[in-house]
Swiss-Prot record:
Record GO biological process: urea catabolic process
Superkingdom classification of source: Bacteria
Cellular compartments per GO CC: cytoplasm
PROSITE patterns with a match to the protein in the record: UREASE_1, UREASE_2, UREASE_3
EC number, UniProt record: 3.5.1.5
Localization terms from the record: Cytoplasm
Protein name, UniProt field: Urease subunit alpha
Organism from which the protein derives: Aliivibrio fischeri (strain ATCC 700601 / ES114) (Vibrio fischeri)
Binding, Ni(2+) 2: 217, 246, 272
Modified residues annotated as N6-carboxylysine in this record: 217
Summary of subunit composition and partner proteins: Heterotrimer of UreA (gamma), UreB (beta) and UreC (alpha) subunits. Three heterotrimers associate to form the active enzyme.
Length: 567
């Protein structure tokens, strides 16, 4: 039997079981847990390689082979870190396993044929496209920024650069909802829109859901009163949608305890749980300890650095239409910015107590930095807290799975769309992101939407090959013509689909049905279901989890930063 050195094998086919990779310039290392390919029967495309007629490529017709195969991919997902081939058929993941020609190769479960395109996954890390659940739809260009960061699904609300949208993720009422659905239909990214949930009677909520809202947002700027919360959750239970809440910073309609009482035992998604983004001051962070609350962070406070506090005041004044000349407005802003709770947020993420990461796009958060900041936090926590339980000195697999779940599967579960997106699993949309390990989490090598390339770094168009400088991200064919409709999905409530909204508005994108939002809890948050008892000192803002103070130093230096953005 012929042999090949481990180094030569990795260079040719990518890492295999037991090999380790460093993620970007962090101190995080993954180790390959399993290899689904067959040694000696790997498929690879190119001159003198395997995927040729009668060798790795079979003779079958279109219906019997996959449309796209990603060869020798290193999959990083909440369920594992494995080496495999990925087959794509009709825009969805057909299989994860061994690709090739079953006529001449053993163990083939993904058939490569004349109709199959090849994406070279050798040496690449593949993740599911990110799901950002806190989008202020201030400008349509956010879609490009999100896609080029590795995010493929936007959930939020708004109507453009107006006061209501600058402050809240709300698309209010039937007319606004329909116009925005018509607008986002043209974007090459998956979209779901929130209606306004700040209503104390049910009729105005039902009509928004029937008009196309995939969920409702309660926000203090519109009134996050106990009556509105109670009513909104009643309608959510009735119509199977999720409720997102930015609670009452000023405690005008009630304190934290009144909000928890209004919520009862019903599930709700709490945004920026730390509080700098808004919510009961100073104790909204206690919601991390509630079994029916799905806690999330937005990225402006993540991770805690020496600059975090200083930049927040001005951002907050702009986003919430506050006047720096009015003392009460300044006091409102200052009440939300607390070093102690910001520091505790990092630790709660590392413990798996905060389940979701999101952006708060152009409304204090940065739409293109959800993934970067997630991994910066993971790195900071490894350096400050050491090896996570379940990990060892050789790999950080458990920590890596915990953090990738925060922006992929958990937000998808929270909003009833995990049957379509959020992980690299059979049957789901082939929204996949390929990374060179050195650029992991920072700059994708390819962003695929429903199996077709949507964005990629591309060199001089007049060059003889694709790579000469200047290289920058450009939209690819999934963003053009009718293909963009087949490559993206609009998420709608079941009620709006039954009411015929896609047909009435002539929506051309794929339609995804929101379901299963009301029978979940914190326990449903994969790798991030820890529910500690949170104590907060209202005078010093000290945070304790199960009696242990949560204290960490601000970072003075971060990975995945300036060295990646010189050009």
């Amino acid at each position: 039997m012929a042999h090949i050195s481990r180094t030569a094998y990795a260079n040719m086919f990518g890492p295999t079981t037991g090999d380790r990779l460093r993620l970007a310039d962090t101190e995080l290392f993954l180790e390959v847990e399993k290899d689904f390919t067959t040694y000696g029967e790997e498929v690879k495309f190119g001159g003198g390689k395997v995927i040729r007629d009668g060798m790795g490529q079979s003779q079958v017709v279109n219906s019997e082979c996959v449309d796209v195969v990603i060869t020798n991919a290193l999959i990083l997902d909440h369920w594992g870190i494995v080496k495999a081939d990925i087959g794509i058929k009709d825009g969805r993941i057909f299989g994860i396993g061994k690709a090739g020609n079953p006529d001449v190769q053993p163990n083939v479960d993904i058939v490569v044929g004349p109709a199959t395109e090849v994406v070279a996954g050798e040496g690449k890390i593949i993740t599911a496209g990110g799901v950002d659940t806190h989008i202020h739809f201030i400008c349509p260009q956010q879609a490009e920024e999100g896609l080029t960061s590795g995010v493929t699904t936007f959930i939020g609300g708004g109507t453009g650069p107006v006061a209501g949208t600058n402050a809240t993720t709300v698309t209010p009422g039937i007319w606004n909802m329909h116009r925005m659905l018509e607008a986002v239909d043209d974007l090459p990214i998956n979209v779901g829109l929130f209606g306004k949930g700040c209503v104390s009677k049910p009729e105005a909520l039902r009509e928004q859901i029937e008009a196309g809202a995939m969920g409702l947002k309660i926000h203090e700027d519109w009134g996050a009163t106990p009556a509105a919360i109670h009513n909104c959750l009643n309608v959510a239970d009735e119509m199977d949608i999720q409720i997102a809440i930015h609670s009452d910073t000023l405690n005008e309609g009630g304190f934290y305890e009144e909000t928890v009482k209004a919520i009862g035992d019903r599930v709700i998604h709490v945004f920026h749980t730390e509080g700098a983004g808004g919510g009961h001051a100073p104790d909204v962070i206690k919601s991390v300890g509630e079994p029916n609350i799905l806690p999330a962070s937005t990225n402006p406070t993540m991770p805690y650095t020496i600059n975090t506090v200083d930049e927040h005041l001005d951002m907050l004044m702009v986003c919430h239409h506050l006047d720096p000349s009015i003392p009460e407005d300044v006091a409102f802003a200052e009440s939300r910015i607390r070093r102690e709770t910001i520091a505790a947020e990092d630790i709660l993420h590392d413990m798996g107590a905060i389940s979701v990461m999101s952006s708060d796009s152009q409304a204090m958060g940065r739409v293109g930095e959800v993934i970067i900041r997630t991994w910066q936090c993971a790195n900071k926590m490894k350096l400050q807290r050491g090896i996570l339980e379940g990990d060892n000195e050789h790999n950080d697999n458990e920590r890596i799975k915990r953090y990738v779940a925060k922006y992929t599967i958990n937000p998808a579960i929270a909003h009833g769309i995990s049957h379509e997106v959020g992980s690299v699993e059979k049957g789901k949309l082939a929204d996949l992101v390929l990374w060179n390990p050195a650029f992991f989490g920072v700059k994708p090598a390819l962003v695929m939407k429903s199996g077709l390339v949507a964005y990629a770094p591309m060199g001089d168009i007049n060059a003889a090959i694709p790579t000469p400088q200047p290289v920058h991200y450009r939209p690819m064919f999934a963003c053009y013509g009718k293909a963009k409709f087949k490559s993206s999905m609009i998420f709608l409530s079941q009620a709006s689909i039954e009411a015929g909204v896609p047909e009435k508005l002539n929506l051309q994108s794929q339609i995804g049905e929101v379901k299963g939002c009301r029978n979940i809890s914190k326990k449903s948050m994969i790798h991030n279901s820890y529910t500690p008892n949170i104590e907060l000192d209202s005078q010093t803002y000290e945070v304790k989890a199960d009696g242990v103070p949560l204290v960490c130093e601000p970072a003075t230096e971060l990975p995945m930063a300036q060295r990646y953005f010189l050009f």
